[in-house]
């Protein structure tokens, strides 16, 4: 929880999950991503809940410019 990621497959809200890619331990891992509202592919998201089955709940999260 609390990590940022990028959606590689859009979520459809209650219509179904998508997929999120997250930087972990010097590499990238993917997780099934659920959201309350649809979120488009390549959107920056924040993980707000995780489950042992490699599924996470995400919300859209604005990416800050450096």
Regions found by a protein language model. Give the residues of each.
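Terminal membrane-proximal soluble interaction domains of membrane-associated proteins
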Residues: 1-66
